[in-house]
Each structure stands twice: as structure tokens, then as C-alpha cells.
Regions:
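Amphipathic alpha-helical segments used for helix-helix packing
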Residues: 92-117, 164
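Hydrophobic/aromatic-rich alpha-helical bundle segments in the mid-to-C-terminal region
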Residues: 115-119, 123, 137-185, 189-198
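Alpha-helical DNA-contacting segments of helix-turn-helix folds
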Residues: 52, 60-66
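Hydrophobic alpha-helical connector segments
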Residues: 61, 71-99, 148-155
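Key DNA-contact positions within bacterial/archaeal DNA-binding proteins
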Residues: 46
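Basic, helix-initiating cap at the start of DNA-binding domains
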Residues: 1-27, 31-43, 56-57
């Protein structure tokens, strides 16, 4: 029997995650039946569950994948950029990502077992945000009168608010200036320090 290359396995896993993202976004966790997952991924249940133990593991892997992508953006450009990407028309699968994010939030609220499993995986976004903020503070770009943990919590709260706003279908056309304000709120303002009395 021929061996399957790691590249092939990785591509198949990506195909499953991409299809599952669409399926979970459209139907929610409960509505994403095995049959619907097969249709969305264009693969058999055997192929899907060769890579993932069960539907719960698939959903967790998908949510973790989204969180890792966000953490990568945060590390390079900050959490506000993640929010800007959500608003950008050209962002990859924004509605599907949003659906997954909302389903994670719902399950965190209603499913204690999921909450426990997710807690182990969800720290990466918070960690990436705090590291980015610390680097910005060391570079002199971040306000120093508020603790980094508080600033990270503020930014995460704004992200959750933006996700809710988009989920409700509210207009997002004019939110760029709002994100500018959020960004300015965490930056260090040197103008006051540089003004010398006459």
C-alpha cells in the first residue's frame, strides 16, 4: 500500500477544516450533522474522522485554527488589525470565521465540558496580545499609566463587541474611525509631555 505524504495529509486536513468552517457557520454545532460535514468537505465520514476523533474534536481544532491565525496577526500587527481585517471586504471567509466565533461563544456559555476543553486552547490570543502590548510599551509606543493586562482585556472586549455588532448585521461601513479611536486610546501620547511652559 503506498504511503501518503505529509503534504497530502496536511492538505486533506485543511480541506476538512475549511469545509467544516462553512458547515458550522451555516448550521451551528448541533445542526452540523455528519452528513452535512460530508457535503461541505466533499469527503466521506471515514476520511473526516481519520483526521479528527469526533465532531467535538473537529470543532475544537477549527476554533483553535482560527485563534492561531488571529494570534499570528496580533503578534505582527496587533489586535486592532484583527478587527480591521474583520471589517475588510477582502478578508478570507469573514462570515464563516464570525459564525465559528459565535458558536464558540454560545458553547462557552452553555457547555461546561466544552468550556474546560476550550480554556486549555484559548490562551494563545490573550498571550499574543499581551506580548505585543509589552513590546509596544518597551518601544515607547504604549501608554504607561494602565497595566498591560487591563489594556489587553479592553482590546479583547472591543473585539467581542465588534463580533456581536457584525453578527447582528448592523452596518459596519463607518467603523474604521472607531477602530482608530480604540488604537489611539492605548497609544502613548507624547504631545502633552513635549509641551514646555512658556
Amino acid at each position: 500500500m503506498p504511503r501518503v505524504s505529509q503534504d497530502h495529509l496536511d492538505a486533506r486536513r485543511r480541506q476538512i477544516l475549511d469545509g467544516a468552517r462553512i458547515c458550522f457557520a451555516r448550521h451551528g454545532y448541533e445542526g452540523a450533522t455528519v452528513r452535512r460535514l460530508e457535503e461541505a468537505t466533499r469527503l466521506s465520514r471515514g476520511a473526516i474522522f481519520h483526521h479528527f476523533r469526533d465532531k467535538e474534536s473537529l470543532f475544537l481544532a477549527l476554533a483553535e485554527d482560527d485563534a492561531a491565525r488571529m494570534a499570528d496577526v496580533v503578534a505582527e500587527q496587533g489586535l486592532v488589525q484583527v478587527m480591521r481585517d474583520l471589517l475588510a471586504n477582502g478578508s478570507e471567509h469573514p462570515a464563516d470565521w464570525l459564525g465559528t466565533r459565535l458558536e464558540v461563544s454560545r458553547r462557552l456559555r452553555t457547555d461546561p465540558e466544552f468550556r474546560a476543553r476550550w480554556a486549555e486552547r484559548s490562551e494563545q490570543l490573550t498571550t499574543a496580545t499581551r506580548r505585543r502590548l509589552r513590546r509596544q510599551r518597551e518601544a515607547g509606543n504604549l501608554r504607561d499609566d494602565v497595566d498591560v493586562h487591563v489594556l489587553a482585556a479592553f482590546l479583547e472586549l472591543v473585539l467581542e463587541g465588534l463580533v456581536s455588532h457584525l453578527a447582528m448585521g448592523l452596518p459596519a461601513d463607518n467603523l474604521g474611525p472607531v477602530l482608530d479611536l480604540v488604537e489611539e486610546t492605548v497609544r502613548r501620547h507624547r504631545a502633552r509631555e513635549e509641551i514646555t511652559p512658556a
